[in-house]
Amino acid sequence: TFINVKCTSPKQCLKPCKDLYGPHAGEKCMNGKCKCYKP
């Protein structure tokens, strides 16, 4: 799921993705936006 958080590295997506899907969520930074994966 893409979320409305800008990023330059996946580390910036860590907290928003964990807030969304919990502590085992996965994250990537794609095209300047965070993408979160369900655990």
Swiss-Prot record:
Alphabetized InterPro entries for the sequence: Scorpion_toxin-like_sf, Scorpion_toxinS_K_inh
Localization: Secreted
Which tissues is this protein detected in according to the database?
Expressed by the venom gland.
Q: Which domain of life is it from?
A: Eukaryota
GO cellular component assignments: extracellular region
GO molecular function terms attached to this record:
ion channel inhibitor activity; potassium channel regulator activity; toxin activity
Q: Which UniProt keywords apply?
A: Calcium-activated potassium channel impairing toxin, Disulfide bond, Ion channel impairing toxin, Neurotoxin, Potassium channel impairing toxin, Secreted, Toxin, Voltage-gated potassium channel impairing toxin
Q: Where is this site: Aromatic residue of the functional dyad?
A: 37
Q: Which residue positions does UniProt flag as site: Basic residue of the functional dyad?
A: 28
Q: Which cysteines are joined by disulfide bonds?
A: 7-29, 13-34, 17-36
What Pfam family is a match for this entry? Toxin_2
The record's comment about this protein's domains reads: Has the structural arrangement of an alpha-helix connected to a beta-sheet by disulfide bonds (CSalpha/beta).
What family is this protein classified in? Belongs to the short scorpion toxin superfamily. Potassium channel inhibitor family. Alpha-KTx 02 subfamily.
What does the protein in this record do? Blocks human voltage-gated potassium (Kv) channels Kv1.1/KCNA1, Kv1.2/KCNA2 and Kv1.3/KCNA3.
Q: What protein does this entry describe?
A: Potassium channel toxin alpha-KTx 2.23
| Phylogenetic classification of the source organism | Eukaryota, Metazoa, Ecdysozoa, Arthropoda, Chelicerata
